[in-house]
Amino acid sequence: MAAAGTCGTGTRSTGSMVAAASTNNVTSFQRRGPRASGADSGCSRLVSIAGTRPSVRNGQLLVSTGLPALDQLLGGGLAVGTVLLIEEDKYNIYSPLLFKYFLAEGIVSGHALLVASAKEDPADILQKLPAPLIDDSYKKECDEDVCSHKMEPDIKMKIAWRYQLLPKMEAGPVSSSRFGHYYDISKRIPQELIETSKWHGFFLPEKISSAFNVESCSLTPGYMKLLQFIQNIIYKEGFDGSNPQKKQKNILRIGIQNLGSPLWGDDICCTENCDTSHSLTKFLYILRGLLRTSLSACIITMPTHLIQNKAVIARVTNLSDTVVGLESFIGSEKETNPLYKDYHGLIHIRQIPRLNNLIYDISDVKDLAFKLKKKLFTIERLHLPPDLSDTVSRSSKQDLAESTKLLGPGCGMTAGGKKHLDF
């Protein structure tokens, strides 16, 4: 009886537990650690900041470079806390566009900017940023540039039909609240966006003084001043990741123009064995340390083609996380080469960061070319256009027939001498 009573009690208790579980929708699955529910919960691992997204490869927080095609090549975007080095083209025509795209993306996304230059006033640089294109305006503004170059789906290629299956580097635009935007380089960014944005300017001629002594730290005065300026902005404005602020988090976009040029007081572009060759590498080393512990991303343009010592270029590459080189066709033999008639230069992905990985995939970053259209700067996969003419084949047959007449009947011909050479 006792046993029966116990079983009955157990049955009733089990039934009541099941009923309670069904009433409260309780499952057997339990999350590890504290729950992320509730308005006051701060346990979310991923930081939610406007204009950013986590990488699908390594979970790193990414920002857009302002050029969606370049974001795709870099694995989704530029990782926060890293340095993007742009090797300037020979005449410095196309590299400033990537620099301006990066800054314009920061203004549209609501990020803070830090613009440093020894050549041009940062305020003037911001005035020359391209205007953003949002959804509907993209169709109106880019019909002439993009739609005219698209292949009709009903027209099939006669030669090299496999090109139809290649992925396209450019995609449609997105709304202002999403990741990455398109820009019209023929128009300037609205003045209202510049006035509402938060930016800091570093113009070297205004910051440097002749009495500044940096012999103890072995850095040029320009580099030392810039490092101090960046450090102050990171710590005072709350971009320090190791000491997070309670206010709303934001991203600091740092843009440094023409680093390593003589305008910065560096002579690595003048002589091969200069006394300050270590100054640039030490600057990059300290800069990376500041970026690693902060919510910031940096883009640097550098005239590497002017650096005399190739060993310095290798060190600069190793001290950068991502390296992209631009090779312009202006002034070279490729400018008149019919194979490159549809492009203005080549783009080389020298290095991709290994973030939370041992290796990185470089299979999709080869054979790339860029084209500057009327309103867009596009990156495309380099390919040769199909040759649909038969002029070459006909002329070669005529030349071959004439050569067989000169060779005579003893060189691979029959007695009649009417057949071509038999290989």
Curated annotation (Swiss-Prot):
Q: List, alphabetically, the GO terms of the cellular component aspect.
A: cytoplasm; elongator holoenzyme complex; transcription elongation factor complex
User: Biological process (GO) annotations?
Assistant: regulation of transcription by RNA polymerase II; tRNA wobble uridine modification
Note the superkingdom of the native organism: Eukaryota
| Keywords from the named record | Cytoplasm, Nucleus, tRNA processing
One GO term in the molecular function aspect is: phosphorylase kinase regulator activity
| Keyword Cytoplasm attached | yes
Q: Give the UniProt subcellular location, in the record's own words.
A: Cytoplasm; Nucleus
Cytoplasm listed as a keyword? yes
Q: Name one Pfam family in it.
A: PAXNEB
Pathway(s) annotated for this protein in UniProt: tRNA modification; 5-methoxycarbonylmethyl-2-thiouridine-tRNA biosynthesis
Summarize subunit and interaction data from the UniProt record for this chain.
Component of the elongator complex which consists of ELP1, ELP2, ELP3, ELP4, ELP5 and ELP6.
Q: What function is annotated for this protein? A: Component of the elongator complex which is required for multiple tRNA modifications, including mcm5U (5-methoxycarbonylmethyl uridine), mcm5s2U (5-methoxycarbonylmethyl-2-thiouridine), and ncm5U (5-carbamoylmethyl uridine). The elongator complex catalyzes the formation of carboxymethyluridine in the wobble base at position 34 in tRNAs.
Q: What PANTHER family does this protein map onto?
A: ELONGATOR COMPLEX PROTEIN 4, PAX6 NEIGHBOR PROTEIN PAXNEB
Family named by the database record: Belongs to the ELP4 family.
| Protein known as | Elongator complex protein 4
Upper lineage is: Eukaryota, Metazoa, Chordata, Craniata, Vertebrata
Q: Which gene encodes it?
A: ELP4
